[in-house]
Amino acid sequence: MARPKNVKHIFVTGGVISSLGKGILSASLGMLLKSRGLRVAIQKYDPYINVDPGTMSPYQHGEVYVTDDGAETDLDLGHYERFLDESTSQTSNLTMGRVYKSVIDKERNGDYLGATVQVVPHVIDEIKERMAEQAKNSNLDILITEIGGTIGDIESLPFLEAMRELKLDMGDGNLINIHLTYVPYIKAASELKTKPTQHSVKMLLGVGIQPDILVCRSEKQLSRDIKNKVGHFCNLNDLDVIGLSDCATIYEVPLMLLQEELDSRVLKKLGIKGYQEPALTYWRDFCNKVKFPQEGEITIGICGKYTEYPDAYKSILEAFVHAGASNNVRVNVKLLRAESAEEPTFDFAKELAGIHAILVAPGFGDRGIEGKIRYIQYAREQNIPFFGICLGMQCATIEFARNVCDLQDANSTEFNKRARFAIIDLMEHQKKVKEKGGTMRLGSYPCIITDGSKAHMAYQKFLVNERHRHRYEFNNSFRTLFEERGMLFSGTSPNGELIEIVEIKNHRWFVGVQFHPELKSRVQKVHPLFHSFVAAAKDYARGVQQMDMAIEMPSFMPILNEEGESKSE
């Protein structure tokens, strides 16, 4: 295959409604192109004025995805990494806030030589420079850029104008726009309606952009007649109208797009020839394992503070999909509201009936903390597999201090600055930090693992690198006491000072980690801790089933005489 001389650009936009899945579309297309032997990267442009999503509420933004180099980014970058098996970075997520900040800083430095600084040309030029810089500094064939928001949003206009100008600058065959729209199915009329898509394209034309390809989300498959109609009214060949109906799992999307020949249309429009056929055997096998698990199903409870909005735990949910497939089981998830467990009359046995493991999720602040601690206590005492991530690990050490080490006033200084026993305390280098945004311990750090621990059994190695996002750490003043009472500190920083992994020795599977393993789980590289946790939950479920079967068996066997008849007859 002849490599393109210049980096080719694909811009993905969305219309009609939000949350259509531009991130999944971008990731799926990137995976298909990579499987053909092309070098592909994906980036996300977000129109909000925040510099990054690090200080945004999970209820508004969902999960904050952390990269190896410490960027706090949009959750769509998680999809990019999981689908492409490629790491993203600081440059993979650009917000309008970062653009404006850069422009204002340049104005203060006198870089514009006294000019009146305006959206056109200064803001637009700043965006175009970022676009060109990402392509120039990468060893790429294709750069996919997802533009957040929906066509018609005021805040997206600078990104769209920059895309329009860049397409003119680069010339034909170097940049295409894929527009994702929605074709609603009206049940009363038993009909798919194309008018919203037509209006969305009209708005895109209004800012000077003719989409090159339309991808139409719908509940039902698009017929050839519908594609012809959409193409006719949107200035497109019907072959450039791609149908994308609902599917059982997001991991089927690449296979559906392959069937619709989206990748072939993209390569033709970009003038790329001689590419190989996509190798997707592993991907098909993975999808079959997700849809048709061979060893049944299990249920894992996720105890968290933001359970009303599952996107706050997006990477955890996807890691369970990967670990379920690697264990040949379906992992069902039940979201457990931490605050509910703080009620004195809360019935844990009833709430956790049918649950085979408990994960206590990350978070910030004191809301729901006592509920999390009670869930952890129940998991420890009932020998239920437990996994604590970041705040979940910190809560596990507080619970252990209170109920095993008899330190009844144990707490974290995040929740009680005057805690008598500060099991969790602010990291030393954080004590002088005043700003909130981008100031935590962020990114990938090494961790040394203890031989013979559950962590070592999972990883099968002594040195790992994991991603972090925290300000607080375990207080080493209590380390000796905890070890005497049965806790194993199985993972630490290389200097041994920062506790990364804790375990309870006499428990079937009780592990807490300071880092975020969910951020490194991928389709082709399930995270070892999630695989091990799901395996423990599967074993626990089998034990419960065997106990249930034993209970259902008769409690006595009749005594038979020599003729084989019951003596009681």
Curated annotation (Swiss-Prot):
It is an enzyme of class 6 (ligase). CTP binds at residues 18, 153-155, 193-198, 229. Mg(2+) binds at residues 76, 146. Keywords: ATP-binding, Glutamine amidotransferase, Ligase, Magnesium, Metal-binding, Nucleotide-binding, Pyrimidine biosynthesis. GO terms for molecular function: ATP binding; CTP synthase activity; glutaminase activity; identical protein binding; metal ion binding. The active site is at residues 390, 516, 518. InterPro entries: Class_I_gatase-like, CTP_synthase, CTP_synthase_N, GATASE, GATase1_CTP_Synthase, P-loop_NTPase. L-glutamine binds at residues 59, 363, 391-394, 414, 471. GO terms for biological process: 'de novo' CTP biosynthetic process; pyrimidine nucleobase biosynthetic process. Its EC number is 6.3.4.2. GO terms for cellular component: cytosol. It catalyses: UTP + L-glutamine + ATP + H2O = CTP + L-glutamate + ADP + phosphate + 2 H(+); L-glutamine + H2O = L-glutamate + NH4(+); UTP + NH4(+) + ATP = CTP + ADP + phosphate + 2 H(+). ATP binds at residues 19-24, 76. Pathway: Pyrimidine metabolism; CTP biosynthesis via de novo pathway; CTP from UDP: step 2/2. Residues 1-272 are annotated as: Amidoligase domain. Allosterically activated by GTP, when glutamine is the substrate; GTP has no effect on the reaction when ammonia is the substrate. The allosteric effector GTP functions by stabilizing the protein conformation that binds the tetrahedral intermediate(s) formed during glutamine hydrolysis. Inhibited by the product CTP, via allosteric rather than competitive inhibition. UTP binds at residues 18, 193-198, 229. Residues 299-543 form the Glutamine amidotransferase type-1 domain. Homotetramer. CTPSs have evolved a hybrid strategy for distinguishing between UTP and CTP. The overlapping regions of the product feedback inhibitory and substrate sites recognize a common feature in both compounds, the triphosphate moiety. To differentiate isosteric substrate and product pyrimidine rings, an additional pocket far from the expected kinase/ligase catalytic site, specifically recognizes the cytosine and ribose portions of the product inhibitor. HAMAP family: PyrG. Catalyzes the ATP-dependent amination of UTP to CTP with either L-glutamine or ammonia as the source of nitrogen. Regulates intracellular CTP levels through interactions with the four ribonucleotide triphosphates. NCBIfam families: PRK05380.1, PyrG. This is CTP synthase. It comes from Chlorobium chlorochromatii (strain CaD3).
